[in-house]
Amino acid sequence: ESGAFLFGNTGETLASADLVIANLEGPITDHASVSETSVIGARDNYVFTFDPSIARLLHEEHIGVVNLGNNHSLNFGKEGVARTKAYLTDAGVAYFGSPLSEDEHFLIRDIRGTRVALVNYNEFVWQGKEKALADIVEVRGEADVVILYTHWGTEYVPATDKMKRLAREFVDAGVDLIIGSHPHVIQETEVYQGKTIYYSLGNFIFDQYFSPETTAGLLVRATYDPATEQFSFEDIPVTLKNTGQTVLTQK
């Protein structure tokens, strides 16, 4: 199937947004896939890479920015991160959350006159919390809105107490919205100090078909009103089919 097949009927929803942000769970490299030829459960079964054509596909499917701050972005080392950034740039897709200490970890974009800062918290890098807090402080004075994209927690279970403590600490530091990934299941949403926390959106395009929980995900349409300085949200559920296609969940 063509790459567009993977996105099913989500295209119109994605195209309607001013900016679509996604988590890219692995590097884009010229290397052959390791996990594809490995034994399920073996260590190398979790070494991911994407074909270079994926960068152009992301652009064609209206994904404008991707988060690189996750536990698979270094699967092919520094060279893998460098190739990923190059392929994304060539395709017109921006990125933030690089796991390399020498890179800038955040991105600020102007969206209809509102300066939006995208910051990453990656639980799986050294001093991830400290780096995220430093970035939040740095961008707080430059942006109208700070969105924190977190890669955190425990897979396949509800949000942990540790995640909830961290979320509050990040909001207290100046974050306006938290969007979480890594658990591969939808976790709860809560409001703290007037700020919304999505602990995990679950999967979007991923090959985990072994439970109802891993075949469910959320797209979140976040609309910011500069007059009130408040967000409103629409949760858009999606279903991952074992054909590899993701579709809007039928109501």
Report residues per predicted region.
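Acidic, metal/ion-coordinating pockets
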Residues: 1-251
